[in-house]
Amino acid sequence: MPSPAPSHPWLALSATLAVQVLVTMALVSASVLAPAVAPTLGVAPERIGLYAGVGYLLAMVSGLRSGHGVAAVGALRLTQWALLSCAAGTVLAGLGPVATLLPAAALIGVGYGLVNPATAAVLNHHVPTTARGLFFSTKQTGVPIGVALAGLLMPLGLVTIGWRATAVALGVACVLTALAVQPSVKRLEPPRMPPPPDGALRLLVTVWRHPGLRAMSLASLAFATTQQVFVTFLVALLNLGLGWSLAASAGLLAVSQVASAVARIAFGVVGDHWLAPWRVLVGLGLTMALSCVALGAVALGWREAPLAVVAAVALACAATAMGWNGVFFAALAQRVPREDLPRISGATQFFTFGGGMAGPLLFGESVRAGAGWGWGFVAVALVPLLAAWNLARASRSR
């Protein structure tokens, strides 16, 4: 199918970026608040891995159905429904008893899983092919921006209005963002495509049988594992492992996200103009492995490490472990037809969120079992290292 001329690239970017910021805040806010809130609820802080795991499990499932959702209601309209699902989850978490936290995580996960395939369809329709890396990477800066805002605003809300009111306020913000997108629906909505012909299982089989898509899917699983372990446990590592205050720990998380946002855009430009996105992904896998080893070394042997050293290591982890998403979607858009992008991105996202689900859960349980923060991060480094090797091998065999 020929590519239509781009029409509203910057409006499309603004709308999809706003959506990405809010759903990310909804997903990670619990991780920021866990060290302070979990003990008051009678829950160990490392059990936040279970909450994150439930969210990502539901994101995996909803992402597989995103192609049907785009066909049924439209891509941009689906992002509005995703925001409302996240709003319902945050409000439920804020108003309900402890038993409702996992259902709240499920609602947030459903919304989060719909966003990437839907926003990819919107951007792919409006963005010139020569600038995919820049636009997709800029949209994906919504993830570190969302994490940074959560790191800044959640502790502030905790001490001013309490964590429950803060969660409800975040839900209200999601609803307001869904309403703000409404005036742009007619201008941004891509033409409707027929519903995907294959079911979820067949779609996964299709992706798995394609060598390039299989390598990319496994890389996304590995990179998401690393990313979510970093985002979920950095505050706890600094607060509980290195003795930092919660405010200082969350503040470093926020600053690291600013660095990762800049890195995402830079990697996207590199993928557009100098290196193939595939090669950029290989390099990111290698560097995120080195960064995780450095973070683990700090946690293992240097409790009194200077602030500058800890900050530099955290920035390196954030830039690499959180800098891959935009380049990944740009590479995916190069490999699949425009009309197949929502369903194929939903299928590869199944692996991405599988890493997001398993990583925090396994890491949290390993810490509880006595592995400690340092050795946990050293072990995580093996995951992106193997993914980089597999991507390079698949690239040579094409």
Q: Can you describe what each PLM-predicted range is?
A:
Residues 2-6, 188-217:
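Juxtamembrane intracellular "pre-TM" segments in multi-pass secondary transporters
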Residues 30-31, 212-257:
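Extracytoplasmic gate region of multi-pass secondary transporters
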Residues 335-370:
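A late C-terminal transmembrane helix in Major Facilitator Superfamily
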